[in-house]
């Protein structure tokens, strides 16, 4: 039996699934790669009228082509079927019918896929901006044997201005990697697949032979499909044992329409994580691009969201098409006032934001989840079980959490370090929302987010504003150091505390000292009275106790 690692080392020609890349077989439905061979279709002769019309349209196409008027991509008279390519049953069920089991999409570790990487490879680490930096793997960017690049996807989920991507965004994140993470990357490119933003910049950044590497659902295969549509001569290929390109696939060259040709070569894209099962190779112009399966940084700690959230709601969270860019433009918010009883704002009954007493907050939710206020977290969680047991409950639309996460014991209490102005709260593989206190500044306590155990959470300064303001400062000073602030941490983990902890501020100091015990140089502001720091509005923000473990 071949190990997964050995499977990724194979560079032999075989009939593979167009969508996931797995080797196909038609003998055993219970074995990986099963597909149903297409049936031979007998064409009816048709009526005389049908034949006359067919001859007329074919003659019309031929005449237009002869005089240079026929454009296969735009002419309505051009009729061209796309040749069929074989797809395994798993992918057909998932893509066409949204019918799947999570067990059919196993998790890959980095060790599972690293066998496909040659020594001294051109590695393009694809990272989602939606949950940045939780899908960024420092070990990939720190590998000195490789030439490392950073491709930041889903840029349309942090800004509605594509003009920010090529210069401001790239400069900011290049300096961010160097100064905050301690790694040097050869190039940074921000892009958006759904809106086709900055795709030419990605092509220009690609080396002659490169490898796309990243977590599941960060947009690697979607990027491949964008590249195929951008460059009409591109196609899906295979590699022989020596690494030479074999291709294009049968049927490619007979397609005249560039758009249809790109569709013919597209890889399978789905909101389901771990969809790609083996390395898939593409020739983009004269560049060999290898799309590797998404991998999980620490499979022992991964939490399958399918075990937490109802299927329909989870599908909506994962589908990039559900993100509404209007929210970035209009900034429509929910007003939330803190109370002594711990009033909370619940997001789909999945996680709950608790602001300090007497604070007035604007919450902008960029996650496709309904919001609802409850008197406290205990009330919200206890109601979730009641709601799930009654299909006709009046609050049914506000709850999507599965058992056993309908018990407060299954939740972690994430305490958020102090902040000035707005922050973005980020949840791994889910997205982010923004919290902005309003009115006269005053420190009334710490914010909390109650989340089912196992879901990673962090906070960050609002990315779009941070990038724009920093670039403006850089233009004024001419000092590249100003393109990304280094006077404070810009990202932080949260502090998970006991449900009964009362003095969260003092406990946070203890936890901060413990977290930084092996990173003394990252410690800040410990010589000052913390109450003095949070007692006054700081500009720029002090970000007391902010610390992120890369």
Curated annotation (Swiss-Prot):
Subcellular location: Mitochondrion
Residues in CP-type G domain copies: 107-298
GO molecular function terms listed in the Swiss-Prot or TrEMBL record: GTP binding
Gene3D superfamilies xref list: P-loop containing nucleotide triphosphate hydrolases
Signal sequence, renumbered to the chain: none
GO cellular component terms attached to this protein's record: mitochondrion
Subcellular location, principal: mitochondrion
Transit peptide start and end: 1-43
The UniProt record lists the keyword Mitochondrion: yes
Family: Belongs to the TRAFAC class YlqF/YawG GTPase family. GEP3 subfamily.
Role description: May be involved in the mitochondrial lipid metabolism.
The protein, known as: Genetic interactor of prohibitins 3, mitochondrial
Species for this entry: Kluyveromyces lactis (strain ATCC 8585 / CBS 2359 / DSM 70799 / NBRC 1267 / NRRL Y-1140 / WM37) (Yeast)
Classification lineage: Eukaryota, Fungi, Dikarya, Ascomycota, Saccharomycotina
